[in-house]
Regions:
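Short, charged recognition helix plus adjacent turn
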Residues: 77-96
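A detector for short, charged/polar N-terminal pre-domain segments
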Residues: 1-19
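Short basic helix-loop element that most often maps to the first helix and adjoining turn
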Residues: 22-38, 96
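Short alpha-helical DNA-recognition segment
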Residues: 32-50
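Short, basic-rich loop-to-helix N-cap that marks the start of a DNA-contacting helix
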Residues: 56-68
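Helix-turn-helix DNA-binding elements, focusing on the entry/boundary residues of the two helices
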Residues: 24, 35, 46, 60-63
Length: 96
């Protein structure tokens, strides 16, 4: 379970990885793609696809290949693209 801090629930890295894997698995299943077919489409081994979906563990390169095969690479391209500033110091540091 995540940690509660100042009214926010913070997930562990493992929990976040598993949620990401679940989302990718749901997209794969929604498109009626088997794990074997996903492996073939993406060039990622069947074992890696299976491990990712059950544990959340995968290399960034393999995740990118899977995203490209599922035509959701834009989701990766946009990750961290609109991270809000935490304070004015970050704004100042970015303009230097």
């Amino acid at each position: 379970m995540g940690k509660i801090m100042e009214g926010f629930i913070w997930e562990t890295a493992k929990e976040l990885d598993l949620k990401l894997a679940q989302r990718v698995r749901n997209i794969r299943k929604r498109r009626s793609i088997s794990q074997e077919k996903m492996a073939s489409m993406s060039g990622v081994s069947y074992g890696s696809v299976k491990r990712f979906e059950s544990t959340g563990q995968i290399s960034l390169l393999s995740l990118t290949k899977i995203a490209m095969a599922l035509d959701i690479a834009d989701e990766l391209r946009n990750i961290f693209s609109q991270v809000p500033y935490r304070d004015i110091k970050e704004v100042i540091n970015e303009t230097r």
